[in-house]
């Protein structure tokens, strides 16, 4: 089993410039799912994706001329593994001095290597330079929780802050906060994110929800794990009929990770780069 502390995170790394898929470091999802009460072998109470954007993607064509592109990768939430982000960056850097016949050949290589590491088929798209001008930006839609003037001193995840008024009629709401901050599981470096919560059910107390999201501020966990913890805590404490949680984290090392989890059929969220990304 690959443990996070054995990954390249927090260690001096040699930056190889020739293709080397062995640098990818998979980490099983199950250990962290055990912590939130999701037993191995049981059906997951959600489905979804981890959406990665690759902003520092470069290789050489067969004439030795550098090529640049943006990449997107979609990893299914039911894959047994995630890929540790620094190892992903180091892997992508190995293309910098590697000759590749075409962007299609590059896409196929990345698809093969990441699918092997994640233990499930992933989707890979290469956005060529000619399409850069068509890339859009946007913010998460929804009612801002950050408008609330809350007072708090709780900075570790506290599900007890969450509650819904089960005596009220069900509502359908989309709530957003830009105050999500957690820390890397291994290095403790800050991870900054925006989160969108879409639900149908008894009205969730918005002040309690905002305090709960703020409570991740000193919590050490990877992005994907934080989003699954948020999903499960809201589901258990507030019991919505439908729930979807989508977070967009700021980039590090040329990568950003945007996990999405839902328990109802809905289109995957738009991959719109936020202002902070």
UniProtKB/Swiss-Prot annotation:
It comes from Ralstonia nicotianae (strain ATCC BAA-1114 / GMI1000). GO terms for molecular function: preQ1 synthase activity. Its main location: cytoplasm. The gene is queF. This is NADPH-dependent 7-cyano-7-deazaguanine reductase. Substrate binds at residues 83-85, 223-224. Pathway: tRNA modification; tRNA-queuosine biosynthesis. Transmembrane segments: none annotated. The keyword Cytoplasm applies.
